[in-house]
Amino acid sequence: MGNAAGSAEQPAGPAAPPPKQPAPPKQPMPAAGELEERFNRALNCMNLPPDKVQLLSQYDNEKKWELICDQERFQVKNPPAAYIQKLKSYVDTGGVSRKVAADWMSNLGFKRRVQESTQVLRELETSLRTNHIGWVQEFLNEENRGLDVLLEYLAFAQCSVTYDMESTDNGASNSEKNKPLEQSVEDLSKGPPSSVPKSRHLTIKLTPAHSRKALRNSRIVSQKDDVHVCIMCLRAIMNYQSGFSLVMNHPACVNEIALSLNNKNPRTKALVLELLAAVCLVRGGHDIILAAFDNFKEVCGEQHRFEKLMEYFRNEDSNIDFMVACMQFINIVVHSVENMNFRVFLQYEFTHLGLDLYLERLRLTESDKLQVQIQAYLDNIFDVGALLEDTETKNAVLEHMEELQEQVALLTERLRDAENESMAKIAELEKQLSQARKELETLRERFSESTAMGPSRRPPEPEKAPPAAPTRPSALELKVEELEEKGLIRILRGPGDAVSIEILPVAVATPSGGDAPTPGVPTGSPSPDLAPAAEPAPGAAPPPPPPLPGLPSPQEAPPSAPPQAPPLPGSPEPPPAPPLPGDLPPPPPPPPPPPGTDGPVPPPPPPPPPPPGGPPDALGRRDSELGPGVKAKKPIQTKFRMPLLNWVALKPSQITGTVFTELNDEKVLQELDMSDFEEQFKTKSQGPSLDLSALKSKAAQKAPSKATLIEANRAKNLAITLRKGNLGAERICQAIEAYDLQALGLDFLELLMRFLPTEYERSLITRFEREQRPMEELSEEDRFMLCFSRIPRLPERMTTLTFLGNFPDTAQLLMPQLNAIIAASMSIKSSDKLRQILEIVLAFGNYMNSSKRGAAYGFRLQSLDALLEMKSTDRKQTLLHYLVKVIAEKYPQLTGFHSDLHFLDKAGSVSLDSVLADVRSLQRGLELTQREFVRQDDCMVLKEFLRANSPTMDKLLADSKTAQEAFESVVEYFGENPKTTSPGLFFSLFSRFIKAYKKAEQEVEQWKKEAAAQEAGADTPGKGEPPAPKSPPKARRPQMDLISELKRRQQKEPLIYESDRDGAIEDIITVIKTVPFTARTGKRTSRLLCEASLGEEMPL
């Protein structure tokens, strides 16, 4: 840290290293206490930041000792007093002694001393820059006053330049020319009036006898690098926090730096402008810079401020570095102020001096650095005329925006009305569609009944046939087909549509007789020519097994019918048992009929029947456990071990009457090639997927309102309410008795409802009237309460009035909610595409799970969320992404399945229980209104209200019933429990699935585009074109990231820097040389931004 010697050949660089010498022998390490003391002393000399000090303090003792030895090997060459004494001797032209004065008189001797002074200044600059902080503080202390000495020498070195400038000024008078030196050296440091006395001792006192010699010596000094090196010394001092504060508080220092612009060396001028620009960016520095140029104007005789600066800028067009520094300084001094008006003023100063015209000439300059600084200034220009036009345009835009907002509000209202109307129409159409489907199903059943009965067995009066009979033959035929598929029976068809059934023997163990009753083997024949047979007897009796009964006729009861039922009226012949009524699915098989059941002679004894319930499925479930019409599923053996889909499967007994009875996942698996699916989703070492717990809806419980009112507070609140109503007590009571809602207002009525007289208050009022006390004793609130309590049926009237006011809004609010529930429920239940989507999901889930958990016959809707959690082996896609691709390739007609589902989001936001409660509340209110009208049938308000709103109430009741039935039906249809499933829970499952499906579609499409782009990119190099153009953006990516980070930081950090640390001035100079200054127009605080055109990295 302590080079004390510099090099004359390298003025701005570090000191020349001394010749290499062998390292001295290492000294032994002292004791720990002494080592720590010497280490702390070395750290203090280094002037390091706290983080570096903390880092070095963590060194071990060996490294600390090496650091101490390195620090102590370096010795400062000269103390600060030596440099100060030499500088004083160069400036002291008055002569400390006659010998010194005589030496100054010799021109040859002075030139020799100038050479020596230049070398001394270089060594001083190196010492100020490299020595430890203690050396610098000693140089600047009150005893040495190194800053004052340095400024005296700087003023002496450039006084001749100022004098020559004034001598060549055509407008100067002779009297002014006779005293240039006094003005140039004493008035340089003029500052504020309070600081003038303080600055007088810093100026050079030249007598008339010595002035000519001093000017001659100053000219010799100014031709050397002394001014440049002096500025370098001041820059080194300002790089320390204490030195910067001393310079900024000095009344003449910045003035002398600004006057150094008159130096002939362009490199010195550029150095001065960089230093002044950095000072301008420090808090309070801008005012000091402007004061320095005011002083410059006075000393140099300018007519306008910055006149000489613009003259140098125009004339020094051969030195690009100076022009860049000059343009940078002008940009910062103009646009770094926060006051916009002051900024315009400074901008016009340079416009008046011809800057804009000169920049137009420099527009085609070849220097990139200069072009960047010029463009930064042009970008910062504050155009008042354009701002005025923008203001006028903004006002017009604001007015237009208000109009557009009004139009948007109007269109939004119209859209909401149109949406409600369309929702009502869709709900009505869904209800009509549902009714039409029911009628179609009824017609199909009648047609099936008539076809199954045949012309010979058809009863003469079809209307007397049992309504539920048509459903039995189809179930019987289904059972026969099922037994045939299982290989338990064989159907033989003979000539003349004769049908016989042969039971195939199965070697099984004898079943136990009581747990699950075994249905008899159902047989059926569509032919009417078959002779009637007795009811089939189930094979659940203990061995030996009973003989199998014959085939029953189509009009006979199925096996589950109870025996000994009376015959139906109007039948041609009485059947042995009546058919089961109703449209419900067939119940489980009943116990075997008694042995006395009538019937034809049975055929010869068949082989023993199969065990009860048929063969078990993969999980050991028999047919009796699967439910009627449910076919047992076999587990699927996959090639690879598949992960388990975490769905909630339904039991076979739970799918009766649901959508899953209509799904055939085995057909889907036969249509798809699952080998690709296995490859992408086979198990790898992966954690178990999250198990979605069953969601439970909790009814919101309203906290009971507490109303514990003290009498005084109640009276005070009543007074406030009456003031809001702004009506007298008698007028209020008359309006209540006449049901005049317009006079009272709904809000006022709701407030009055809180002040209905209590039993205690009524007793007080009764006693007051019985005692016949004067009304004057009562307050205004009490008199109102007295009048208020005299209204007959007051609670009923107040409730009716409140109901009259709330009914239209409440009905208008409830109707769209009911329509949303109806439309959403019916559209979900009637969507064939949604059923096919669920069929595909069921197929894939069984393909993954059946080998371990057995085949599932259905699943909970919440299992759809698990599709997003199941990841492929490479973790790049989910099961939902794969399903989207399969549907797009194999089932393209299903891609828009969500277009069949209406108003799911609106229906999901409806609380059906609350809506139904509100409807019931409206119904009770309407009934109360009707009772009031019966008691007061001459009231036209009640009569008109009942006439206008009774149809609305009837429609609300009908829609609420339809909505409740539709919702419960669709919930049960999908295997959920309507008692525990709310609309918000049910419809949100579909909404989430649709959103996830759409997002997966977009991602799959994006993947396809990226894959196509990669393929196209892979084909391009094969055409002989190297992919070189793509390399520069990749190479510049770190630089662009740095620029983005700089912009992000600088948008958060203000422009005004704080000089609260060492090295701040160097950092500012580095920043402004690297990053062009850009001011945000219209912002109170400017910002530094980084232009992408600069290829340099900015140190932070």
UniProtKB/Swiss-Prot annotation:
The keyword Metal-binding does not apply. GO terms for biological process: actin filament severing; cell migration; cortical actin cytoskeleton organization; regulation of cell shape. Coiled coil: none annotated. It comes from the Eukaryota. It is found in: Cytoplasm; Cell membrane; Cytoplasmic vesicle, Phagosome. Residues 1-13, 517-538, 1013-1023 have a biased composition (Low complexity). Residues 1-31, 167-200, 446-474, 510-635, 1008-1037 are annotated as: Disordered. One of its GO terms (molecular function) is actin filament binding. A lipid is attached at G2 (N-myristoyl glycine). Myristoylation mediates membrane localization and blebbing. Its main location: cytoplasm. Residues 632-1023 form the FH2 domain. GO terms for cellular component: bleb; cell cortex; cytosol; extracellular exosome; membrane; phagocytic vesicle; plasma membrane. Residues 27-468 form the GBD/FH3 domain. Residues 1059-1090 form the DAD domain. It holds the Pfam family Drf_GBD. Keywords: Cell membrane, Cell projection, Cytoplasm, Cytoplasmic vesicle, Lipoprotein, Membrane, Myristate, Phosphoprotein. Expressed in heart, brain, placenta, lung, liver, skeletal muscle, kidney and pancreas. Residues 14-28, 539-615 have a biased composition (Pro residues). Belongs to the formin homology family. The DAD domain regulates activation via by an autoinhibitory interaction with the N-terminus. This autoinhibition is released upon competitive binding of an activated GTPase. The release of DAD allows the FH2 domain to then nucleate and elongate nonbranched actin filaments. May play a role in the control of cell motility and survival of macrophages. Plays a role in the regulation of cell morphology and cytoskeletal organization. Required in the cortical actin filament dynamics and cell shape. Interacts with RAC1, PFN1 and PFN2. Interacts (activated by RAC1) with SRGAP2 (via SH3 domain); regulates the actin filament severing activity of FMNL1. This is Formin-like protein 1. It comes from Homo sapiens. The gene is FMNL1.
